[in-house]
Swiss-Prot record:
It comes from Escherichia coli (strain K12). Belongs to the NTE family. The keyword Lipid metabolism applies. This is NTE family protein RssA. A motif (GXSXG) lies at residues 39-43. GO terms for molecular function: lysophospholipase activity. PANTHER family: NEUROPATHY TARGET ESTERASE/SWISS CHEESE D.MELANOGASTER (PTHR14226), NTE FAMILY PROTEIN RSSA (PTHR14226:SF76). Residues 8-168 form the PNPLA domain. InterPro entries: Acyl_Trfase/lysoPLipase, LysoPLipase_patatin_CS, NTE, PNPLA_dom. The keyword Lipid metabolism applies. It comes from the Bacteria. It holds the Pfam family Patatin.
């Protein structure tokens, strides 16, 4: 009797992606062996480490991050393409991950990216592993796109935030999907909602027009108890809204067999220094799904 293959589809989610580490560790702990891994964006970075038996090294690296470590890894770009070049963080990632071809991974692995010219998803099932990861992680506007075979490639989440279809195409009989964006609306409400006291509102509205203009430009100190979202927050939150709609549509037509959803609304897009909290959320999410996961262990598939 042929052994049933279990596939893991790791979704996008930026800093929440460290939850994938907790999910994988928890699955291993209960005896569920993953045969196939497909990743999108941060899911490709974590998935590749697992596929190459380097997950422990990745966990050691990311759990050592401080807030200032993350800032130092952000190499601002003054050129076109994105706010960050992305070279600094991926150069350090190369110290953990071997330079290898995708087909040489210990487990079947693939990453998804988006072709900006065609608008279609591109599946990396062979070739340069680091190229695939770098392309899949290129959040539009935030990180510079990757040139490949005459095309510009960006984050796979633009077209396929949770690569369930790719996991099945690689031969998975059962797909466990990890969704990191299901509770993003909680963070969006916190980010985009605010209260202005009546007193402050009246004071602000009573300012002459030229003073209000200077206030908006930041030339004088605002009298309102309001902190407007930054340009990066607006961009990333908008992308999350679009990704969530796309994700729901795709999963309606191609649902996973088991869906794991770590809860970590307190971790925002660039909170990569909060790996401990994200990993714990991933482990807890697996524990909550044990009723669905235990049959995979009991049947020894």
């Amino acid at each position: 009797m042929r052994k049933i293959k279990i596939g893991l589809a790791l979704g996008s989610g930026a800093a929440r992606g460290w939850s994938h580490i907790g999910v994988i560790n928890a699955l291993k702990k209960v005896g569920i062996e993953i045969d196939i891994v497909a990743g999108c964006s941060i899911g490709s970075l974590v998935g590749a480490a697992y596929a190459c038996d380097r997950l422990s090294a990745l966990e050691d690296w990311v759990t050592s991050f401080s807030y200032w470590d993350v800032l130092r890894l952000m190499d601002l770009s003054w050129q076109r393409g994105g706010l960050l070049r992305g070279e600094r963080v991926f150069n350090q990632y190369r110290e953990i991950m071997p330079e290898t071809e995708i087909e040489n991974c210990s487990r079947r692995f693939a990453a998804v990216a988006t072709n900006l010219s065609t608008g279609r998803e591109l599946w990396f099932t062979e070739g340069d592993l680091h190229l695939a990861i770098r392309a899949s992680c290129s959040i539009p506007g935030l990180m510079a796109p990757v040139a490949h075979n005459g095309y510009w490639l960006v984050d796979g989440a633009v077209v396929n935030p949770i690569p369930i279809s790719l996991t099945r195409a690689l031969g998975a009989d059962i797909v466990i999907a990890v969704d990191l964006q299901h509770d993003a609306h909680l963070m969006q409400q916190d980010l985009l909602s605010f209260n202005v006291s009546e007193e402050n509102s009246e004071n602000g509205d009573s300012l002459p027009w030229h003073a209000r203009l200077k206030e908006r430009l930041g030339s004088i100190t605002t009298r309102r108890a309001v902190t407007a979202p930054t340009a990066t927050e607006i961009m990333t939150t908008s992308i999350q809204v679009l990704e969530n709609r796309l994700k729901r549509n795709r999963m309606a037509g191609d649902p996973p067999d088991i869906l794991i959803q770590p809860v970590c609304p307190q971790i925002s897009t660039l909170d990569f220094h909060r790996a401990h909290a994200a990993i714990a959320a991933g482990q807890l999410a697996v524990e909550r799904k044990m009723d669905e996961l235990l049959p995979l262990v009991r049947t020894n598939i």
